[in-house]
Regions:
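Short beta-strand->alpha-helix linker/helix-N-cap micro-motif
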Residues: 24-83
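Amphipathic beta-strand/beta-sheet edge segments enriched in Tyr/Trp
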Residues: 23, 74-131
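Hydrophobic beta-strand positions that form the internal "hydrophobic ladder"
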Residues: 147, 195, 236-240, 280-284, ...
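Multi-bladed beta-propeller domains
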Residues: 167-182, 210-228, 254-272, 298-314, ...
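A flexible loop/linker signature enriched in serine peptidases of the S9 family
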Residues: 140, 152-162, 198-206, 221-226, ...
Length: 413
């Protein structure tokens, strides 16, 4: 039993929180062959509360898919302007020009205008980035998505835990919950309006669902023992979770409307960290049934289970990419815990993060292009991002405290 408890504690603490203030992205490695794009500084942007063209440039540069310059040249050119049209009202317009089409109106590949308040300038900037990204790459952009994470602020004899939500680039952080007890395992509902998480309020584990906009909360699971690792089904009607109410930790699925439970695993091993497939038919989970932590896949309907990770002695916290073929996971290499991608069809594992430090808590962007995780960087616990092919690496340094246990939102709006 001591071995079981220590494994569960390790599993849970891999997701436990540090502290996170305003973030600034730092691109540590970019992809070769990035698409050149010229983003000309928007006229009027310097006098507005937010510099729209700078935000768009940062978004596209940090995606790793683009090489951004401010010189007007090449096939892809972005121009725009920001006009003050009233008290705290701005008109933002932009054009994406295709240099191959010429220099007149025929060169306009994409254009849009917005009338907004000053407080919406960052939001519109991210929307412009999404539009440009999708037009050029054919894939939906992730710049308007959000991230959730837990912050631990430590002082002598006391820790404070804060569940926060911010833009995907770390700006506009907003606390959802502050507690003197641990908070962990945030999981976004597929509608992007709710977050499920584990809270130890009252010194016991509870799974709570909180409305992101209103802050209203409801306790979904408060059984004796472990209530952990919530994961929303793709249709938003069910929650996979880990319960130990009958002894060993096992995977269950709860119907959120009726609160009825279906037990998925039923044995004396440690079964934890469930994650849904995109079609909602199967669950990935971590189990020590083979001797050490490995990732397994089980049918929600039949309970038929098979092992999917074989490379290495430690693989855990698997989650599907949107294609249903690739799985992000924690993979131990040479004593370090790294973020890796498992190709289920080929059976191959690709390590994505550097091998000189531990990384954990992978969360995949909704378009599958990037993976968010927590790691140690320059002696601090911070959030990092890595592209699904490992060619692009970003760190989001926290200015105060430690940041960990991130969760990427679905597409919003």
């Amino acid at each position: 039993m001591k071995k079981i408890i220590s494994f569960i504690f390790l599993t849970l603490t891999l997701a436990m929180p540090p502290a996170f203030a305003m973030l600034s992205m730092e691109l540590t490695r970019g992809v070769s062959g990035a698409i050149p794009i010229s983003i000309i500084p928007f006229s009027g942007s310097d006098s507005s509360p937010q510099n729209v063209s700078t935000i768009v440039s940062n978004d596209l540069q940090n995606s790793g898919r683009f090489k951004v310059s401010t010189r007007e040249s090449g096939d892809n050119i972005v121009k725009g302007q920001v006009k003050n049209v009233g008290t705290d009202r701005y008109e933002v317009s932009f054009q994406l020009l295709d240099g191959l089409r010429g220099k007149g109106q025929e060169a306009v590949a994409l254009s849009k205008s917005f009338t907004i308040s000053g407080g919406e300038l960052r939001k519109v900037s991210h929307r412009i980035s999404d539009m440009i990204y999708q037009h050029i790459t054919g894939s939906r952009g992730i710049f308007s998505t959000k991230i959730a994470y837990v912050v631990v602020q430590r002082s002598p004899g006391q820790s404070r835990y804060v569940l926060e939500v911010s833009d995907q680039d770390g700006y506009n952080p907003r606390p959802l919950l502050t507690s003197s007890e641990p908070i962990m395992s945030p999981s976004w509902a597929p509608n992007g309006r709710q977050i499920a998480y584990v809270s130890f309020e009252g010194r016991k584990a509870n799974i709570i669902v909180q409305d992101v906009a209103t802050g209203s909360r409801q306790v979904l699971s408060s059984f004796p023992g472990i209530n952990g690792a919530p994961s929303w089904s793709p249709d938003g009607r069910k929650l996979a979770l880990v319960l130990s109410k009958s002894g060993s930790p096992n995977i269950y699925v709860m119907d959120i409307g009726s609160r009825s439970l279906k037990q998925i695993t039923n044995d004396f091993y440690i079964n934890t960290e469930p994650s849904w497939s995109p079609d909602g038919r199967t669950l990935l989970f971590t189990s020590n049934r083979g001797g050490g932590p490995q990732i397994y896949q089980t049918s929600v309907a039949s309970g038929s289970t098979s092992r999917v990770s074989y490379d290495g002695a430690y693989n855990a916290r698997g989650s599907f990419a949107s294609d249903g073929r690739h799985v992000a996971m924690i993979h131990r290499t040479s004593g370090n815990y790294n973020i890796a991608i498992l190709d289920l069809d080929a059976g191959t594992t690709r390590v994505l993060t550097p091998s000189n430090g531990d990384s954990s808590s992978p969360s995949i962007a909704p378009n599958g292009s990037m993976i968010l995780y927590d790691t140690v960087y320059n002696g601090r616990n911070v959030l990092g991002m890595v592209s699904a092919d490992g060619s692009v690496q970003l760190v989001l340094p926290a200015r105060a405290g430690d940041a960990q246990d991130p969760a990427w939102s679905p597409f919003l709006g």
